[in-house]
Amino acid sequence: EKRRAYGLNSGHWNTSVLMILLFIGLYLLRFVIASALGGQLSEFGKIMANPTTWIMFFTVLVNFFLSVAAFFGEEYGWRYYLQPLLQKKFGLKGGVILLGCVWSVWHLPIDFFYYTTPDMGLAALASQFVTCITLGLFMAYAYMKTQNIWVPVIIHFLNNNMAVVFSGTYSADVLQNQQIHWADIPAALVLNLLIFGWVIFMKPFKEKKKENM
């Protein structure tokens, strides 16, 4: 009962696994489309065919158990605590979009001083808004669908680590000092909306109509 009261009671495991697999599939689809648009589809094919890629992928999965505390802490705050509060006040969709904005601002320091350099910081922040809102929609959908906090925890972990694997660098250095330009933002917005944003039309986001008295 205590675990249930604090949102720690896992459940709906079949749906939970499907949500995680769906995320992995969508994440890779985004990689494929981005590679095709950048004329690097053949390079991505080589990465996928490289056994090292899959060794690193399974290594990342094992590392989840060593770094779970950080991701659990974030998601317990974002998805379990803050999301329902914002949804109650701003609606099922509006609350999640607002949460995505808050989540974006949370990343502000690393947008300027880690992911890129200060001169590109504002573009990086705009890109972060695109990512956090669209990915936040999918994570909110997965959580509302399963009522299992471990689903967004695992998705958050995978999102942060799969770029290291499927970029072909196999190093976290790929996340640092990125070149992010304003001209890249519109395409990123469209792509992320197509990959993750469609969930906003699914049943968990449907507002319940109040019955007439």
Residue ranges and their predicted role:
Residues 157-213:
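C-terminal membrane module of polytopic membrane proteins
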Residues 37-49, 112-120, 171-179:
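Membrane-interface helix termini and inter-helical loops of multi-pass transporters
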Residues 1-18, 33-51, 70, 196-213:
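Membrane-helix interface linkers and caps
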Residues 121-181:
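Functionally important transmembrane alpha-helices
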Residues 72-100, 114-115, 144-148:
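Membrane-interface helix/loop boundary segments of multi-pass membrane proteins
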Residues 63-71, 134-137, 189-202:
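Hydrophobic cores of alpha-helical transmembrane segments in multi-pass inner/ER membrane proteins
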Residues 20-21, 64, 68, 97-104, ...:
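Residue-level signature of the transmembrane alpha-helical core
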Residues 24-32, 101-110, 157-169:
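Aromatic-anchored segments of alpha-helical transmembrane domains
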